[in-house]
């Protein structure tokens, strides 16, 4: 999950611009792209293209929401990322644009950890998180349950089957945005309504914008089919399947009744472009405030902190969209054992993993993929669902496997539960302010969650946050309005910047925000830096001066720190 790795490709940047006065021009006006290109070229940055995100015209006059959608300009340069640090390009661009309200960040390719290990029986490389095993044993023998069954829907686990049956006669239309690698055009698990939905979008460069299907192309750093697997768990078709404990003849999807809007944000779950996720989040928010409300968003990917992601999450929250995002995966704590972004943001539900025996999705066995969790101070908005060894729609054989794994599998279970709750309390929720709907849904899921953990040295909060999903019990929690609005999300603030820059509100200064975002990405990407500030287990404002001094020196010496940030820190 290294968010700063370079791939010998041109540097892309995301330009965000606020305005000094109401009514002043930002970057959304006609001709802005050309102006940006000229300014960057004049500063010595060769530009390939500048593009502003498309704006959706209002589909309904009924919408009275005033949620502000972030104004972003996505710029492709001709500078190679191995020649110049992308953050240095971002700083040069900010200076060239000559606007104190401009924020620029690199449009990094984010790595999302999945599992590749040798399958002893087949002697082949295995992407376990996709359920692509090539032998007669469908489940992963390293984890329970040790049989091929559809178990996660049952009352002893997520309770999704009972919960959805309770609301099946309710005719309220629930929409779920599904952000992933798209869907298979041929797999039987994908509902026809998903394939026909005209609201589907593709945010992968060079692919048709209105077609979110996954062409399932193999190749270097490509892992096709991930979106089909998560979609099956979220809203998959009815299937008739022989299992070790009998015949399963029911819907695989926890929220099969929902209208699903697929957004293809990556050609592979292994690599995710920062801008693609930001654009997809903003697209879903635009739909909502334009009269086509999206109630829940399921995201089984993520990476390093990004300002564009934070702003997109804030806009979605204010529009009333409940976001469920994967907490991430790791191998024995690498690249990080802690929850990734955007799942770590306070306005997002972080989907962690719990095994079928209520144990943490954690192991000390070498080379074994497991789920991210913690630090505890960032688990207040987290929730766990079941993984691994749950049914997975595999595109390799166009079938159902029983070794679905990773927090990618937990995410759609929680999203389905959120959709079920919204379906039951549709009228009551719609009477609330949009952000209150998010808080009411989350309150029900958190309050009803099972507060337990088995065979673990720490409390359930450490691994599961608010507990383990209990979808049917959540329906017993009435809609509440007495919850405080969650503060706006942003990259964690580094106090050393406040001491360097004497300003009444340093966090509002774009250039400092840029330094701060780079620091956050460095800490996220490099464990040796994270360890210097207590591996993020303590709040930054409680870390002593000596440790901050050591941290600053290490950042200045680090090869992946931008020259601009190094110079700034040295001046301290």
What are these regions (language model features)?
Residues 231-234, 238-239, 261-267, 293-297, ...:
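Hydrolase catalytic cores
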Residues 237, 262-347, 358, 395-412:
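Substrate-binding/access-modulating region of protease and related hydrolase catalytic domains
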């Amino acid at each position: 999950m290294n968010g700063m790795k370079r791939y010998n490709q041109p540097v892309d940047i995301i330009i965000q611009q606020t305005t000094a006065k109401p009514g002043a021009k930002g970057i959304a006006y006609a001709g802005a792209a050309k102006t940006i290109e000229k300014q960057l070229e004049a500063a010595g940055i060769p530009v390939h293209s500048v593009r502003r995100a498309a704006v959706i015209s209002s589909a309904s006059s009924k919408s009275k929401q005033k949620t502000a959608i972030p104004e972003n300009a996505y710029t492709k340069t001709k500078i190679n990322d191995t020649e110049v640090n992308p953050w240095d390009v971002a700083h040069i661009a900010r200076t060239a644009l000559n606007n104190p309200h401009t924020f620029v960040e690199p449009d990094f390719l984010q790595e999302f950890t999945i599992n590749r290990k040798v399958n002893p029986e087949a002697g082949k490389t295995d992407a376990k998180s996709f359920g692509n095993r090539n032998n007669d044993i469908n489940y992963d023998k390293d984890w329970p349950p040790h049989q091929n069954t559809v178990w996660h829907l049952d009352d002893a686990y997520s309770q999704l089957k009972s919960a959805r049956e309770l609301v099946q006669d309710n005719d309220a239309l629930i929409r779920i945005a599904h952000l992933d690698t798209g869907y298979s055009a041929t797999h039987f698990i994908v509902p026809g309504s998903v394939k026909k939905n005209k609201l589907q979008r593709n945010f992968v460069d060079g692919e048709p914008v209105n077609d979110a299907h996954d062409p399932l192309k193999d190749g270097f750093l490509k892992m096709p089919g991930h979106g089909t697997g998560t979609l099956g768990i979220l809203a998959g078709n009815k299937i008739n399947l022989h299992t070790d404990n009998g015949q399963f003849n029911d819907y695989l999807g926890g929220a099969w009744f929902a209208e699903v809007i697929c957004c293809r944000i990556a050609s592979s779950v292994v690599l995710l472009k920062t801008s693609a996720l930001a654009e997809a989040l903003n697209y879903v928010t635009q739909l909502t405030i334009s009269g086509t409300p999206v109630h829940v968003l399921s995201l089984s990917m993520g990476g390093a902190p990004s300002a564009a992601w934070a702003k997109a999450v804030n806009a979605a929250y204010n529009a009333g969209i409940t976001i469920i995002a994967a907490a991430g995966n790791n191998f024995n704590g690498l690249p990080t054992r802690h929850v990734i972004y955007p799942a770590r943001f306070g306005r997002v539900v972080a989907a962690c993993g719990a095994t079928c025996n209520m144990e943490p999705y954690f192991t000390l066995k070498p080379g074994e993929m497991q789920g991210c969790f913690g630090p505890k101070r960032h688990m207040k908005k987290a929730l766990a669902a079941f993984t691994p060894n749950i049914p997975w729609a595999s595109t390799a054989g166009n079938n159902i496997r029983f070794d679905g794994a990773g927090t990618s599998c937990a995410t759609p279970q929680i999203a389905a539960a959120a959709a079920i709750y919204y379906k039951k309390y549709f009228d009551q929720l719609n009477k609330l302010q949009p952000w209150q709907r998010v808080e009411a849904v989350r309150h029900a899921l958190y309050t009803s969650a099972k507060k337990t953990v088995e065979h673990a040295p720490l409390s359930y909060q450490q691994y599961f946050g608010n507990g383990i999903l209990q979808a049917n019990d959540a329906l017993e929690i009435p809609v509440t309005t007495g919850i405080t609005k969650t503060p706006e999300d942003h990259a964690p603030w580094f106090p050393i910047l406040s001491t360097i820059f004497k300003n009444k509100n340093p966090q509002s200064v774009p250039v400092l925000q840029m330094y701060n975002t780079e620091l956050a990405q460095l800490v996220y990407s490099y464990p040796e830096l994270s360890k210097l500030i207590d591996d993020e287990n303590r709040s930054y404002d409680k870390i002593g001066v000596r440790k901050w001094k050591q941290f600053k020196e290490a950042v200045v010496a680090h090869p992946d720190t931008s020259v601009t940030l190094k110079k700034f820190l040295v001046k301290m």
